[in-house]
Amino acid sequence: VFDEAFDAWGMAKRGGDYSQFFDADWEKDLTAFIKRDRPHPSVILWSTGNEIPERGGLNNGYSMATRLANAIRDLDASRPITNGICSFWSGLDDYMAEGKNQSQNVSDDITENVWERYTEAFTNGLDIVGYNYLEDLYERDHKMFPERVMLGSENFPKEIGYRWPLVERLPYVIGDFTWTAWDYLGEAG
């Protein structure tokens, strides 16, 4: 189990999501979450979130990322910590609806190490950096961060044939999760 604590932090992703409670309740809720799930051997990875708007440093995102990772380690240091980090481009759904290839967009959209510069401080507290739809950055990022362990934290099932050979070839990429190949009720909120 890739056990994700929060779908939103202090900045809303959708109306009615957890962001309205995050600042007041994150510590209490995270503690209850970890204590509830840590006895389960199926939990292999803790996640502080997925596609968090604060990933580029907004709303004290860098310091919150570190605080969350440290809080998890204080409760359970036996499992690695990650976060599913995506690009900064917000028009992805419209682009994909037009039938265009997402990985082509990512290559064009994220140039000159912009993603790396803005997310490096966000990833500093993580044991494994989750890459959502960013497999084109694996090799380049490995050159910039040779000690970084990477994970395809969210990718399309139809593209696993392209992505899995990267997992097999690149020893610093430890796996790939597809979105979605299981029952899913929808975004929180």
Q: What kind of feature is each model-predicted range?
A:
Residues P165-G189:
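Aromatic/acidic polysaccharide-binding cleft in carbohydrate-active enzymes
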